[in-house]
Amino acid sequence: MPQSPIPTTEVIIAADCWQDQPDAEDVIHRAILAAAERVDAEVGDAEIAVMLTDDAGIRTLNSNWRGIDKPTNVLSFPALQPTGPRGDDDAPRMLGDIAIAYETMRREADEEQKPFDHHLSHLTVHGFLHLIGYDHESDAEAEEMEALETEILAHLGVPDPYADRERLD
């Protein structure tokens, strides 16, 4: 049986505020699918966990893992993978975890006058790209990552999230 290009994705609702967004899980699954189909990475045998949390939860994660004591919109935690060939009996590999904060995400969507689902799609794609090695530490990395995000989001019918901002030179 051929391997699916789509990683297994578990969505964990860790904060009650997400109950107001009953379509959030579907939005996340569509965003992961679109990203997985458009990247040059083998992710079909992998697993991802996406935790939908609140500002307090993501602030704790941000403080513990990055030393930054404030909430943020999304955090990604790529899993460390063993090297070498995988055997047929190996369990699926863990690609990593993504955490998304409701209040910060809602505020950003409102301030930028974007539909909530569009911003959720963007943050999910952004987090997924971090899991497979993309970053935005340098201008060149940011430009590459933003271009890929924009391409993936276009396939979801989401406008370029960077269109209202000056592009990096």
From Swiss-Prot:
This is Endoribonuclease YbeY. PANTHER family: ENDORIBONUCLEASE YBEY, CHLOROPLASTIC (PTHR46986:SF1). GO terms for biological process: rRNA processing. NCBIfam families: rRNA maturation RNase YbeY (TIGR00043). Belongs to the endoribonuclease YbeY family. GO terms for molecular function: metalloendopeptidase activity; RNA endonuclease activity; zinc ion binding. Its EC number is 3.1.-.-. Binds 1 zinc ion. It is found in: Cytoplasm. It comes from the Bacteria. Zn(2+) binds at residues 126, 130, 136. GO terms for cellular component: cytoplasm. Pfam families: YbeY. InterPro entries: MetalPrtase_cat_dom_sf_prd (IPR023091), YbeY (IPR002036), YbeY_CS (IPR020549). It is an enzyme of class 3 (hydrolase). It comes from Bradyrhizobium sp. (strain BTAi1 / ATCC BAA-1182). Its main location: cytoplasm. Single strand-specific metallo-endoribonuclease involved in late-stage 70S ribosome quality control and in maturation of the 3' terminus of the 16S rRNA. The gene is ybeY. Keywords: Cytoplasm, Endonuclease, Hydrolase, Metal-binding, Nuclease, Ribosome biogenesis, rRNA processing, Zinc. Its cofactor is Zn(2+).
